[in-house]
Amino acid sequence: MALAPTDMLCFALHSTAHAVHAAYAPLLQPLGLTYPQYLVLTSLATTDGQTVGQLGGGLRLESNTLTPLLKRMESAGWLRRSRDGKDERQVRLALTDDGRALAKKAESVPRAFAEKTGLPMSDLADLRDILAALRDRLKPAKA
């Protein structure tokens, strides 16, 4: 017997992903950020100076998705791309002063999202860990 979509894990994950993106949009819009830009910004705010490859690996984004995104963020004045002094093949990413200021403003977003869910922080942390474990079993990060 076939399962109804509402009884499938894949549908629960898919529909939740859409709901999460929709919930983040009004939190990011006043900052002028899209969700992918927010991920890049917060990743660089945490670990500045990453290579494009390191950033893509951490965010699980392919370079064909990441490169245009980085170009737009550089044009907006939020980050700087430069060749690595030791390996010219590598491009390093650094937040500008404007990018750091924007990242500071974005620090309120995770708590605002958590409040929107109405779930206890401990449940959200458990959910994050379970989802990360599932993701890593299905598609481990590239080395």
Set out the residue ranges of the language-model regions:
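N-terminal leader segment of winged-helix/HTH proteins
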Residues: M1-L31, L124-D129, A133-A141
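Compositionally biased, low-complexity segments enriched in small residues
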Residues: A2, R60-S63, F113
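N-terminal helix-turn-helix DNA-binding core of bacterial DNA-binding proteins
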Residues: F11, H18, A22-T65
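Charged, amphipathic alpha-helical coiled-coil/dimerization segments
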Residues: G49, K71-A132
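DNA-binding alpha-helical recognition surfaces that contact promoter or target DNA
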Residues: P68
